């Protein structure tokens, strides 16, 4: 392991829950407006996850006022307060780009049931 890998390992967050594409997430993001700070919650379906060490990202999609909104979050960003997994989805793909074309009930994802 070289110096760069060691520095990246130190900066990675340890409290990230296990999630994948298809899961419904609630992401708490720190927002700074002037001298005020607040937490904004973004809830939606994870449509993709890109794992590459410190540069890992995930994309969350939600429907807001009839418009699809997608937001890309860096996984190890200090601006992310916490990530909550609300529902584990049952999908057969790693990238759910097909959800962009679907509307209404067709865009629903089945819930994975545990026995």
Curated annotation (Swiss-Prot):
Pfam families: Ribosomal_L19. GO terms for cellular component: cytosolic large ribosomal subunit. The keyword 4Fe-4S does not apply. InterPro entries: Ribosomal_bL19 (IPR001857), Ribosomal_bL19_sf (IPR038657), Translation_prot_SH3-like_sf (IPR008991). Keywords: Ribonucleoprotein, Ribosomal protein. The keyword Lipid biosynthesis does not apply. Disulfide bonds: none annotated. One of its GO terms (molecular function) is structural constituent of ribosome. Transmembrane segments: none annotated. GO terms for biological process: translation. It comes from the Bacteria. PANTHER family: LARGE RIBOSOMAL SUBUNIT PROTEIN BL19M, RIBOSOMAL PROTEIN L19. NCBIfam families: rplS_bact. This protein is located at the 30S-50S ribosomal subunit interface and may play a role in the structure and function of the aminoacyl-tRNA binding site. Belongs to the bacterial ribosomal protein bL19 family. This is Large ribosomal subunit protein bL19.
């Amino acid at each position: 392991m070289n110096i760069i890998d060691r520095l990246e390992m130190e900066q990675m967050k340890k409290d990230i829950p296990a999630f994948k594409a298809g899961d419904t997430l609630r992401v708490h993001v720190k927002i700074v407006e002037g001298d005020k700070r607040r937490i904004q919650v973004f809830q939606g379906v994870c449509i993709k996850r890109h794992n590459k060490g410190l540069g890992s990202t995930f994309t969350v999609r939600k429907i807001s006022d009839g418009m699809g909104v997608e937001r890309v979050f860096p996984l190890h960003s200090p601006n992310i307060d916490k990530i909550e997994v609300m529902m584990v989805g049952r999908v057969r793909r790693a990238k759910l780009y097909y959800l962009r074309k679907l509307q209404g009930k067709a865009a629903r994802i089945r819930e994975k049931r545990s026995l």
